[in-house]
Amino acid sequence: MFILNNRKWRKLKRDPSAFFRDSKFNFLRYFSAKKFAKNFKNSSHIHKTNISKAQSNISSTLKQNRKQDMLIPINFFNFEYIVKKLNNQNAIGVYILPSNLTLKPALCILESHKEDFLNKFLLTISSENLKLQYKFNGQIKNPKSVNEIWTDLFSIAHVDMKLSTDRTLSSSISQFWFRLEFCKEDKDFILFPTANRYSRKLWKHSIKNNQLFKEGIRNYSEISSLPYEEDHNFDIDLVFTWVNSEDKNWQELYKKYKPDFNSDATSTSRFLSRDELKFALRSWEMNGSFIRKIFIVSNCAPPAWLDLNNPKIQWVYHEEIMPQSALPTFSSHAIETSLHHIPGISNYFIYSNXDFLLTKPLNKDNFFYSNGIAKLRLEAWGNVNGECTEGEPDYLNGARNANTLLEKEFKKFTTKLHTHSPQSMRTDILFEMEKKYPEEFNRTLHNKFRSLDDIAVTGYLYHHYALLSGRALQSSDKTELVQQNHDFKKKLNNVVTLTKERNFDKLPLSVCINDGADSHLNEEWNVQVIKFLETLFPLPSSFEK
């Protein structure tokens, strides 16, 4: 970063044009230089003491970073980033995070603190070289001067703001919106200008024993020492199943046990790895940071890039969750009968494949209600009916067998598969089903490849069992499936475009890059998939060496 020492401040006031011409810092490059310098020097609103203190804080931070002439790249530019920077400036207020992270968070300031806050806010976005836009009189405004910002913000009680930066390596994390609110203060209460999830009217006696509106930018949920009723007070883990068809030991076992006939269940494209796991982990770190621990279930060696020293990662070999009599296995149906046996796994977990990628910020509420009820994303249409038939898709036959069990148990018929997306699972329900259907679980567990008599435990049985027993509900979240027989280039480009625009309303919760039917032989498919992955998730995660 670039430090504005006393000499540079004097140069800015004395000759703004020369300062902007010579400075790599490009201070407030989106504002008018002359107007800023004039306001900086003469405005009664911007107090020298505040600016001196803010400059001192910025300089101290910058010296710690030991960066004299360049801006440090930002890995994750989001609302939490600006809150942290404002706390470094000793700004005072509260913030409100929405239950749905695709909605705007709010930053709430007392009217009596408005002047001090705006000084610190403008210094923050200036020192961070951020671009500011906001909605004013029904239009998105690009302010040209500090005076313009000051005049606009002193005339309104709340405003939607957008901050953006060119200091990230990925355009998907280069901007965000939030709402800035100014609260009126009465002798007995504080009144927020808009309704929020906690309380629009905050009685002062309810915060007499905490630091809300007294110190720092704090979470409004600190109104109580207890969790809010909509918040989740349980951990959620993440489980991947992963295979690498280039693993030498895996290849030897596969050749030994592969049946003579060919089907989609034995196609090598089902086991192809193009480092999707790496990109899936990047997507979860970027968009699903609420996860406690990540378990990766496999019968292959870990990829060379994976950092197993990361405390959040645990590699789980098949023999840790499956009996020796069932090994080796090449059937996802078999592996999925045993996920609840992972040592140390939380009761609540999300089951995902390496080809499922998150496309927007998510939290626990996207997968479970706060009372523990799971959220399902069943397909909008049904296609499970009839009897198991040789030669028909193995996933369909597995669902048909599961359907037979469900009809006997609940006296209802089901038809909908789960979408190709991360699945909300509970170990207590899986243990319950295993105890109730031991023969079907054991038979599926011991099939080396997907077979006609399998049950699809995580693909079908679990979701409808949980739904019919009152422990799951359908979710309206959109997901996207991309296969080689689709217009895959158009689909992938659409996700990239929506991501760059941060169009969360239209973005799916996740996208699945679904291999199969020898898709690994399709060169255009392979090229477009790699391009998509590297465009959407270019930044290494903390899980990589």
UniProtKB/Swiss-Prot annotation:
Protein name per Swiss-Prot or TrEMBL: Capsular polysaccharide phosphotransferase SacB
Keywords: Exopolysaccharide synthesis, Transferase
Pfam families for this protein: Stealth_CR1, Stealth_CR2, Stealth_CR3, Stealth_CR4
Protein family according to the UniProt entry: Belongs to the stealth family.
GO molecular function: transferase activity, transferring phosphorus-containing groups
EC number(s) on file: 2.7.-.-
Role, per record: May be the polymerase that links individual UDP-N-acetyl-D-mannosamine monomers. In serotype A the capsule is composed of repeated units of (alpha 1-6)-linked N-acetyl-D-mannosamine-1-phosphate.
Record organism: Neisseria meningitidis serogroup A
PANTHER family the record matches: N-ACETYLGLUCOSAMINE-1-PHOSPHOTRANSFERASE SUBUNITS ALPHA_BETA, PTHR24045
GO biological process, one term: polysaccharide biosynthetic process
Further remark: Stealth proteins are part of a protein family that is conserved from bacteria to higher eukaryotes. Family members were first identified in microbes as proteins that help pathogens to elude the host innate immune system. Microbial stealth proteins are involved in the biosynthesis of exopolysaccharides. Stealth proteins are predicted to function as hexose-1-phosphoryltransferases.
